[in-house]
Curated annotation (Swiss-Prot):
PANTHER family assigned to the protein according to its UniProt record, in alphabetical order: VACUOLAR TRANSPORTER CHAPERONE 1-RELATED, VACUOLAR TRANSPORTER CHAPERONE COMPLEX SUBUNIT 4-RELATED
UniProt subunit comment: The VTC core complex is an integral membrane heterooligomer composed of the catalytic subunit VTC4 and the accessory subunits VTC1, VTC2 and VTC3. The complex exists in 2 different sub-complexes: VTC1-VTC2-VCT4 and VCT1-VTC3-VTC4. The VCT1-VTC3-VTC4 subcomplex is mostly found on the vacuolar membrane. The VTC1-VTC2-VCT4 subcomplex is observed in the cell periphery, probably ER and nuclear envelope, but localizes to the vacuole under phosphate starvation. Each subunit contains 3 transmembrane helices. VTC1 is a small membrane protein without hydrophilic domain.
Name of the protein: Vacuolar transporter chaperone complex subunit 4
Residue(s) at site: Important for inositol polyphosphate binding: 22, 26
Binding site residues for ATP: 200, 264, 266, 281, 294, 359, 361
Biological role: Catalytic subunit of the vacuolar transporter chaperone (VTC) complex. The VTC complex acts as a vacuolar polyphosphate polymerase that catalyzes the synthesis of inorganic polyphosphate (polyP) via transfer of phosphate from ATP to a growing polyP chain, releasing ADP. VTC exposes its catalytic domain VTC4 to the cytosol, where the growing polyP chain winds through a tunnel-shaped pocket, integrating cytoplasmic polymer synthesis with polyP membrane translocation.
Species: Saccharomyces cerevisiae (strain ATCC 204508 / S288c)
Region spans: Disordered: 489-512
Chemical reaction(s) catalysed: [phosphate](n) + ATP = [phosphate](n+1) + ADP
Zinc-finger is among the record's keywords: no
Region (Important for inositol polyphosphate binding): 126-133
Record keywords: Cytoplasm, Cytoplasmic vesicle, Endoplasmic reticulum, Isopeptide bond, Membrane, Transferase, Transmembrane, Transmembrane helix, Ubl conjugation, Vacuole
Lineage: Eukaryota, Fungi, Dikarya, Ascomycota, Saccharomycotina
Amino acid sequence: MKFGEHLSKSLIRQYSYYYISYDDLKTELEDNLSKNNGQWTQELETDFLESLEIELDKVYTFCKVKHSEVFRRVKEVQEQVQHTVRLLDSNNPPTQLDFEILEEELSDIIADVHDLAKFSRLNYTGFQKIIKKHDKKTGFILKPVFQVRLDSKPFFKENYDELVVKISQLYDIARTSGRPIKGDSSAGGKQQNFVRQTTKYWVHPDNITELKLIILKHLPVLVFNTNKEFEREDSAITSIYFDNENLDLYYGRLRKDEGAEAHRLRWYGGMSTDTIFVERKTHREDWTGEKSVKARFALKERHVNDFLKGKYTVDQVFAKMRKEGKKPMNEIENLEALASEIQYVMLKKKLRPVVRSFYNRTAFQLPGDARVRISLDTELTMVREDNFDGVDRTHKNWRRTDIGVDWPFKQLDDKDICRFPYAVLEVKLQTQLGQEPPEWVRELVGSHLVEPVPKFSKFIHGVATLLNDKVDSIPFWLPQMDVDIRKPPLPTNIEITRPGRSDNEDNDFDEDDEDDAALVAAMTNAPGNSLDIEESVGYGATSAPTSNTNHVVESANAAYYQRKIRNAENPISKKYYEIVAFFDHYFNGDQISKIPKGTTFDTQIRAPPGKTICVPVRVEPKVYFATERTYLSWLSISILLGGVSTTLLTYGSPTAMIGSIGFFITSLAVLIRTVMVYAKRVVNIRLKRAVDYEDKIGPGMVSVFLILSILFSFFCNLVAK
């Protein structure tokens, strides 16, 4: 789909006169080139630049006016909401209809914000594409020059966070008829009869504002301090992750080892924040019956360095807390035990700052209700804090001091920073056993707005990206970072609409001018990140329309032996290769998969040279039980054969005693083989190795030994008689 066609289909009718005149600019570019026999002059360049300036002024002015209008409308509705709420305790309280009118007005404002964000995004894409086309066709490089003009009129950089928070508060009041739910945001966390599930998703920057607006219609933005006006800095979260030079914690978390820990120091807000949280995250496998846990305690910033060095003791950390007596003694003792363990690990493993993560978080949750909690982290950035290359970035401090929360941290070298291209959505559900999540949540996580990325970790991504020369294994999502996660929108019940009508004009997936219909079709069928574990069930292969006819894909060995058999020069060599092929088939498996005809596989995603992709593997408890049952079954065969041997040895004739030797040897061989196979399987399962667990030798070996034992016993008796 050409961008001009996409623009004409996606434009909002009310804003149609204010869009970039992309087709006119494209026509001007092509006509001037054709009139000058493909030559581009400085005069033509000046004229084209003036046309771009006119379009930029038009778009920027409209965005500025519309943005001011939205803020004015929000302010007016805020006054109406406050007035309506004050009347609740009067003699003439407002009716339900009054709140419904306010809710409709806010829904209309939400639609305006959505349309304005879409308008800005589409026009910015238009400018980028026409400049790219200009540079490609004329040979003049306009992009860096015009980028300065775009930055001077940044209609595409409007931040809607403050607006989203304000609208969320007002919408929550209107939706609850002036009685918004209040309570502890952490309530409900200790109830037991719940199924807790956490899933993570990537969100393309084009979809961030729309996603926020959709969520706030169902959950309010969680504001921790309602007594102060929201500021941009309030949403900032910074974490310093610790590890040693061997990256032991990184590899433990990457492999999801049982008991793998992550240690970090975290603070909320700007650099003036005095309270630092010392946190430890511990991974637990499902088979242990325990849940992964995060534990933390607070520490004053001035004591952090001494605590990490062991100079500031645990008793000193909690001396004031003990003296005040505001918390139960058992809780204080638990915190002291946690602090002691963290300090011990820090010193023993020689942990030091390695990676910093920074992001602005928007949290959505009903206060006092932990059933659905959603957080959206934007401007995610990872920064190096280590000294592994000989550069002491922290200067023996617990964090580097040359940056704060001034994203995008332009003062840093490119080798020290990784600006993550997507936002990270985290959905935490807590439902009754057997209960489905809310319908709107299911639609949201299944929509085109998000891309599932199971087990995504900021710490793992930061280390794998910034310390690429030190790591051998990388997370499964890293080779896919260049894959476009945008997908064509599908109709849902959660899309942003104006009250009283439906708006299905959205089609937010942008294609380059050179893109053709084949690419669009490929995107329609694309499963996104092909290594996502949950998605692999449904998207094992990217397939064309399938039929019932299956075709066979043979292994390399099978194909080799088939060629040898066909090209055999004499019957003896042919028979030889047939026998070898038979044993290869028996010991190495069929290695033949029946797949629908027309299926194709995506083989473009590969690990970088010298790296291995670590895919998280979940080992169910039943795997261990099945291994033990198999071991006990073989053990019972060994015991049975041993019992036969012992019986013949004890109660049989002298000839039978000699015949029992065969059964004894068979019993011993089965026992040794069983123990070896069991030990090998347990180790492979514990290490989550992708190996063949089938025992191809055992059954045949037992059968052969048993036959030989019977024949030997029969022969002994035959000779004796």
